[in-house]
């Protein structure tokens, strides 16, 4: 029996999430829109909307969803007023309000099942599952060296190589944790290289996970040309030193790169320490927000 569980695509940026989104979008039952900035932003600022059992608070949330700066709602091609009215009339939870927007997108395309894609979701799996407890998570994984090289070649990545390496390793670690604690029906992994070289086999496996029939048109999608800028020798050395066991776990063989210079290892260690501290601060803030929640946040629609 086909499922209506929401689907979330996540992973390190430049891992192939956009390709997988296009593949799933080609399925006759699945609608996954271009990236928005709705879910994480709404969740992190949920305290600002107060008790959503109050109509005025639902109205404020609805107005932010359809017209807030930077939400990218306009990319969904929806009637903003109609969606806002549906949110105000809908169940009084944050997850429900968000789901109404994505359901409207799927409805516009004549499809019964919705999903969403954003790489950063991999660091916010707990938030996803609080909002959508029945969600199915699809983690797209790519050779970390290729991800870092690809990030270097993009115009929007301004955080440098150290942060690119840390972003990949933290995504892998978050996925490992999810795989250990979530049921196999809630989390799966897809490797970019297999999507490119043998898309039908990888997509058939994914459709089994999603409880969907395989649709041949999914495999007709092709990857965009990579933005790879290439790795300098010290960058490859650092990648392989840091990623080594994680690469091997997914069948990516390290080369015989030399040990990276101490200054590069030290700089990387400093950056990862700062990132861990920032993550702990976010966790403390989230705990305070949870304690102050006037009612559950989970969607009542799924």
Predicted regions and their residues:
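Active-site micro-motifs of SAM-dependent methyltransferase domains
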Residues: 26, 38, 146, 194-197, ...
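P-loop (Walker A) phosphate-binding loop of NTP-binding proteins
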Residues: 12
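PAPS-dependent sulfotransferase catalytic domain
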Residues: 86, 102-217
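A generic secondary-structure signal for well-formed alpha-helical elements
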Residues: 27-34, 210-214
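A conserved segment at the C-terminal end of the G1
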Residues: 18-30
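PAPS-dependent sulfation machinery
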Residues: 32-116, 121
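ATP-binding Walker
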Residues: 15
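PAPS-dependent sulfotransferases, especially Golgi type II membrane carbohydrate sulfotransferases
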Residues: 1-8, 91, 152-155, 176-180, ...
């Amino acid at each position: 029996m086909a499922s209506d569980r929401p689907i979330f695509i996540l992973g390190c940026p430049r891992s192939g999430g956009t390709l997988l989104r296009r593949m799933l979008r080609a399925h006759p039952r699945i609608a996954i829109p271009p990236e928005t900035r709705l879910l994480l932003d709404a969740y992190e600022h949920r305290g600002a909307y107060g008790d959503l059992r109050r109509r005025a608070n639902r109205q404020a949330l609805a107005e932010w969803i359809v017209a807030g700066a930077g939400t990218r709602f306009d990319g969904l091609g929806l009637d903003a007023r109609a969606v806002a009215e549906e949110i105000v009339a809908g169940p009084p939870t944050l997850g429900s309000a968000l789901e109404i927007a994505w359901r409207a997108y799927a409805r516009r395309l004549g499809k019964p099942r919705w999903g969403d894609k954003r790489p950063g979701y991999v660091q916010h799996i707990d938030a996803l599952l609080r909002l959508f407890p029945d969600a199915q998570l699809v983690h797209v994984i790519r050779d970390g060296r290729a991800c870092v090289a690809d990030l270097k070649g993009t115009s929007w990545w301004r955080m440098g190589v150290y942060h690119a390496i840390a972003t990949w390793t933290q995504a892998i670690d978050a996925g490992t944790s999810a795989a250990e604690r979530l049921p196999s029906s809630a989390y799966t992994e897809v490797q970019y290289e297999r999507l490119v070289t043998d898309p039908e086999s990888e997509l058939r496996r994914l459709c089994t996970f999603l409880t969907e029939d395989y649709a041949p048109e999914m495999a007709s999608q092709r990857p965009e040309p990579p933005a790879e800028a290439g790795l300098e020798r010290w960058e490859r050395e650092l990648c392989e030193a840091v990623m080594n066991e994680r690469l091997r776990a997914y069948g990516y063989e390290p080369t015989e790169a030399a040990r990276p210079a101490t200054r590069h290892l030290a700089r990387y260690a400093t950056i990862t320490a700062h990132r861990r501290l920032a993550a702990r601060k976010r966790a403390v803030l989230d705990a305070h927000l949870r304690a102050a929640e006037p009612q559950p946040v989970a969607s009542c629609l799924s």
